[in-house]
Amino acid sequence: MEKLAIFGGEKIAKDDEMKFNWPRITNDTEKVVIEQLYKTISIYDNSGIFGEFEKKFADYHNKKYALLSNSGTSAIFSMFEAIDLRNDDEVLCPVYTFHATVSPMMYFGAKPIFCDSDNEGNISFDSVKNKYTENTKAIIVTHMWGVPIKDIQKIADFCKEKHIYLLEDCSHAHGAEIYGKKVGTFGDIAAWSLQGQKTVTGGEGGIILTDDKNLFNRALLQGHYNKRPKSEIDKSDDLYKYYLTGMGLKLRAHPLAIAIANEQFGHLNDFLKTRNEYAMKITKALLKYPFLKTPTISSYTINSWYAYGLQYIEEKAYGVAKEKFVDALHAEGLIEVDIPGSTGLLNALLLFTEPNVILGRLYPNKLPMQKGFSNAEQYVEQLIKIPIWTFPDESNIVDKYIAGFKKVCDYILENKGL
């Protein structure tokens, strides 16, 4: 049995050999930025790079309308505006997600109603059905870590049955599919982040897609004014009268960011092909360890692998704590192994229990802390994650991560502990 690095043995690799570097800036990336610099660095409508990217992104998803914004959070904010969310409206949402899936709704005085997770960390359809009331106006979902929600079609059908909106946060899931249908096409409106670590990135940015012109018009007026609303909202629409001012905000993207995103987007299918090959390779290598539960890979899904989430089951690892397991992997040079901190359960966050302190104009009183999320609690308690590398020339890094995991896991099995 090879001595573990945490006990003074030789590491699998040096730390600087095991980083996840993203995005990869190429000569093509530099070229499109420089070209855009000499065209314009501010766009007031959907001309130029804005129109080009919006059309490509909409066509890729077979959607009619696309709208760029300055961040994924702003894009989600615009979805809530699009559905005319109001004070005391209830929105069903995942208790386990990044907070910005839910936090923008607090600017409308709405009430988030948290739903439990399924065994993949995505929102549970059973929980959705149980939490629905006559006050429910919408459901917002997240395809966590780039894994499509297994019951997304059931959720979409439920929304149609109840005549409520379905909003999709696809910020982790660019290009992901389930049953031959891309995420972001199941609901009434969907949002993607183009932030620096996202699969399609411009550094910062966001985009929404919809087939509903009324939803598009409201979102457009929220974050844009003058030229773009004037040219894209029909004069017969009551909203047209507000084109000059919009709703008072400016959430426009930056052309340089969208130039980068447009160049990156051209490689998305290649990115996903390589990521899925690496994810399958990692999964096959780790399946034999009873204390590791790998994410489900099925023939009817294409995951985008924003991250690869593993569940570490301490009681099956002879009581070795998750933190100690991760420390042993870090010691081998596997520096990207992570226990997520910024993404977790939302129900106890102060914004959702004591909004009265900072948003007293909308929430005069505290909100009761919602409880009863056993699946999500277990998922978060057991979760560790690694990135999935994206390029064929990174296969050696993937192999070293597999070797590091196997080294530590084999030690635990043979020695019944660590």
Q: Model-derived features: where do they sit?
A:
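Conserved PLP cofactor-binding pocket of PLP-dependent enzymes
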Residues: 227-238, 286, 325-384, 415-418
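Conserved PLP-binding active-site segment of the aspartate aminotransferase-like
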Residues: 296-299, 305-317, 336-355, 382-395
